[in-house]
Amino acid sequence: MTDAYSNAGFDTGEIGYGERLAILVVDFQLGCTDPKYPLGRLPMVHKAVENTARLLKVARSKNVPVAKSYTAYGSRQDMPYWKVKPLIDDFIYGHPSTELNPLIHDPDYDFTFCKSAPSIFFNSPLTTYLFRQGVDTVIITGCTTSGCVRASIVDAFSHGLRVIVPEECTGDAEEEPHRINLRDCGRRYADITTLESVINYLETL
């Protein structure tokens, strides 16, 4: 962190874990993770899927709630004004691009739902689910770091949740926006940590 941010009082310490946590997985659907689709050709995202699969295996073994989103629409008529052509063309209900990546999907365990905006919280059933589970801490994973993940971090913070982000479990098209957005969120809204650190914590539950 630069002296300007430090001198202004940013990043004053860790938020830490609360009493009950959940894992949130943002948009690891085939349209974002399978190379057959234009948005699915990002090596950093592929690695994030593999890392998140490791995290979820431990989380499920500890009975930690897991909530996953995918993005889809009925038609272009109910889409926001996206500037992402593959999303506009493919992310329609029933299209294969909206199916979740099998590496991270456990339909018998996870709470899975469709979202229609960048944030996993916006107009979705997630808040009610987390309330019913007694969750006060969320570990956010998914793609992309500078888009839907950042929007979800800010909304989680705005809902009064503790936010933890294992950096290896998120990905973007390029390293720079990934790094800059995580660093900035870490100054303000979230603890940015490592996959191993989160797994080590889960093992204590």
Question: Could you tell me what each predicted segment is?
Answer:
Residues G94-C143:
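Internal catalytic-core helix/loop-beta-alpha segment
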Residues M1-D106, L202-L205:
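Active-site acidic carboxylates
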Residues T145-S152:
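Short glycine/serine/threonine-rich phosphate/pyrophosphate-binding segments
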Residues A173-G186:
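Active-site-proximal loop->helix
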Residues Y189-L205:
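A charged, well-structured terminal subsegment
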Residues I139-G142, R162-E175:
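A short glycine-rich beta-strand->turn/loop micro-motif centered on a GG-aromatic cluster
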Residues S61-V64, G134, G160:
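Glycine-centered short loops/turns at secondary-structure junctions
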